[in-house]
């Protein structure tokens, strides 16, 4: 049973990677909606929710960079719909951010953040304190003293870390991502979905298998975009920390039914980086790099399409419950040789 489930998933994986639920057309627009998420925000009590530098806050930098990114994306890709999850200084809940992205049927989710290092912990010997203690019992009980070291504990800012990092959700979060994909399946389907594929039960084994593969597809696309973002950062002289899976703090990435990345634009705890992140020039550079990465991502999607393979696949049942192994082996061979 496990083997057959794997075989079904393998077929869906290939079909999802090629079709993204729909037949490929030469005039197809590969990116229709991009969601830009400015991280954090000011809370109802007026407090800041993100990291703090010497004189600035993550909330403000995220919004400033996101605004410039939105403007550049709209100018560069006028046919692409750009949606903001947070357009003001006020905080938006993580659940609402995901709802905005899923409701607008985003093809891409880019969350803008600022990194920070925790302060360095220090312990210094401040002196000694005399401590009285007793040994023995009864007539043999004796009073004694000893010197006990006293320490002073304090912290200093960690200013060494610098550079960018771009994250995707961790592998252990794939199940949560798959749930998001399945729950938002009606939003992902095109208007004439039933006409093309018939009545599909989102709880059916076939649809669950497809959701699992769609999750895998989103993971691959997220990883590709994250690498492209870091490559563009390197081109402008930023120190790139690379593309990584994030184990914590990425709920909004796993709750969005689309390729999703979280961009750490720099370390606010580094004085040089804090100045750069607050400068108009720095914010424009960061926005331009991400915009170029989106363009590279679109080109990559276009090159991945294989209309011939899609046509052959669509000639079969749209959501097959069983697939012969020889067909799967042929598809798997094609997938590996076409890389």
Features from the language model and the residues they span:
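Generic alpha-helix initiation/capping and coil-helix boundary signal
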Residues: 6-9, 94
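Short connector loops/turns at beta-strand edges and beta->alpha or beta->beta junctions
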Residues: 39-44, 266-270
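Bacterial N-terminal signal peptides
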Residues: 8-16
């Amino acid at each position: 049973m496990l083997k057959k489930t794997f075989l079904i998933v393998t077929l869906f994986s290939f079909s999802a990677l090629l079709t993204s639920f729909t037949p490929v057309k030469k005039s197809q627009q590969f990116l229709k909606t991009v969601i830009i998420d400015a991280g954090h925000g000011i809370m109802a009590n007026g407090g800041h929710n993100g990291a703090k530098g010497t004189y600035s806050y993550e909330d403000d930098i995220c919004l400033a960079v996101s605004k410039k990114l939105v403007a550049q994306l709209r100018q560069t890709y006028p046919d692409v719909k750009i949606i903001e999850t947070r357009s003001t200084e006020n905080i938006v809940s993580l659940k609402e951010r995901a709802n905005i992205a899923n409701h607008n049927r985003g093809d891409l989710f880019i969350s803008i953040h600022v990194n920070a290092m925790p302060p360095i912990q220090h312990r210094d010997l401040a002196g000694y304190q005399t401590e009285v203690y007793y040994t023995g019992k009864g007539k043999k009980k004796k009073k004694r003293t000893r010197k006990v070291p006293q320490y002073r504990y304090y912290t200093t800012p960690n200013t060494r870390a610098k550079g960018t990092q771009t994250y995707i959700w961790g592998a252990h979060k794939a199940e949560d991502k798959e749930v998001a994909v399945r729950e938002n399946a009606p939003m992902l389907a095109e208007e004439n979905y039933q006409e093309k594929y018939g009545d599909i039960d989102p709880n059916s084994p076939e649809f669950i298998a497809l959701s699992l593969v769609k999750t895998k597809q989103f993971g691959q696309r997220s990883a590709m975009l994250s690498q492209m973002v870091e490559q563009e950062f390197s081109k402008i002289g930023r120190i790139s920390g690379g593309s990584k899976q994030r184990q914590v703090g990425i709920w909004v990435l796993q709750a969005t039914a689309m390729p999703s990345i979280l961009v750490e634009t720099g370390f606010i705890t580094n004085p040089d980086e804090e100045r750069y992140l607050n400068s108009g020039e720095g914010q424009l550079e960061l926005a331009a790099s991400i915009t170029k990465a989106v363009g590279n991502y679109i080109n990559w999607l276009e090159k991945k399409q294989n209309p011939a393979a899609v046509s052959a696949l669509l000639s079969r049942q749209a959501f097959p419950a069983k697939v012969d192994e020889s067909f799967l082996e042929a598809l798997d061979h094609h997938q590996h040789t076409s890389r």
